[in-house]
Amino acid sequence: MTIRKAKLNDVPDIHRLVNHYAGERIMLPRTLTDLYENVWEFTVVAEDEGRLVGCGALKLYNQEVAEIRSLCVDETLKSKGIGREVMEELLNEAEAFGLKTVFALTIAPTFFEKLGFREVPRERFPTKVWRDCLRCERYTCCDEKAVTMELADRPTKLGESAPEATEVSS
C-alpha cells in the first residue's frame, strides 16, 4: 500500500469513491470541478497495482485550524487500517504546516474518537458553518457531529492514549 499526495489523474477515482458514500448520505457529494480545484488538499492511498482505495483531504481555514474532509475507504477494504493510515498522513501534514487544531464533521464520531479526537459543539467552528454548512441541503436536519484534536495532544500512534507527562529531576 502506498500513501501519497493526490495527482490530477486521481480526480475521477476520488470522485467515484467520495460520491459512492454521498449516494448513501454518509458524506457530502463533491463535483469534479470542485475536486480538480482542490486536488492539492487530498492524500490518496493506492494499492500496488495502482487502484485508488482510500482518500482524505486537509482543508486549511487559517494559520491554526484545518478540517479533515472526504475521508473514505473503498467499501470492500474497510476495517483494514487504511482510514487510519490516511488520517495519520493528514495529521502529519497538519503538523508540518504548524497547525494547532484539526476537526471534522462526521456521522462516524466513534472512528475519530478511537484515534484521539473528542466531540465538541459544531458552533466551535463558525467559519465552517458559514462557508459550507449553510449551503448544505441537510443543514436544518444535520446529523453530523463535530470532532476535534489538538495536535499538541496527538497520540504518538493513532488509537493509543497520549503519553503521560513525566517529571525529570536533576
PLM feature segments, named:
Residues 29-41, 47-48, 54-65, 70-71:
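A conserved beta-strand-loop-helix scaffold within acyl/acetyltransferase catalytic domains
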Residues 79-94, 104:
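Conserved acetyl-CoA-binding loop-helix of GNAT-fold acetyltransferases
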Residues 2-14:
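A short beta-loop-alpha structural element at the N-terminal edge
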